[in-house]
Curated annotation (Swiss-Prot):
Keyword match Plastid: no
Site, as annotated: Transition state stabilizer: 34, 133
GO MF term set: 2-C-methyl-D-erythritol 2,4-cyclodiphosphate synthase activity; metal ion binding
Annotated gene: ispF
Protein name from the UniProt record: 2-C-methyl-D-erythritol 2,4-cyclodiphosphate synthase
Keyword flag RNA-binding: no
Length: 158
């Protein structure tokens, strides 16, 4: 068994869509990023890669590469899952926390949970996602951006 932890944060400022956990969230601003800015999936990818000792998302999908400009993060997650399988790992379970002052995310968490559990090949009872605020403290509390943490347990396939 191996544990992986991932973190990502992006600031608001894009005129594009706000996508979190593969779900489009109605909001007047998107997140500034080289890809689609999905901090939830980026944190999850880092947790998966870290648990398997395969580096991080920046190593596999560098923001200096035109190939990943405006990339759909769900496709990046799929590529990470292929890498895990190639290296003999499967996901046992996962837990995520999104940290955002705005927008309110509770109505979208079930769709994110379903989307990500499916992408990881997990039943819903083995994947959790929740959201919190920073009670108006720091850059997130000032509504300057969104962050996410992910923890996963990986099993080595025999």
């Amino acid at each position: 068994m191996r544990i992986g932890h991932g973190f990502d944060a992006h600031r608001f400022g894009s005129t594009g869509k706000l996508i979190l956990g593969g779900v489009e969230i109605p909001h007047e601003q998107g997140l500034i990023a080289h890809s689609d800015g999905d901090v939830v999936i980026h944190a999850l990818c880092d947790a998966l890669l870290g648990g398997a000792a395969l580096g991080d998302i920046g190593r596999h999908f560098p923001d200096t590469s035109a190939e990943f400009k405006n990339a759909d993060s769900q496709k990046l997650l799929h590529r990470v899952m292929v890498l895990l399988k190639e290296h003999g790992f499967k996901v046992s379970n996962g837990d995520m926390t999104i940290i955002a002052q705005i927008p309110k995310l509770a109505p979208y968490l079930p769709a994110m949970r379903e989307t990500l559990a499916l992408a990881l090949g997990l039943p819903l009872q083995r994947f959790n996602i929740k959201a919190t605020t920073t009670e108006r403290m720091g850059y997130i509390g000032r509504a300057e951006g969104i962050a996410a943490h992910a923890v996963v347990l990986l099993l080595e396939e025999q």
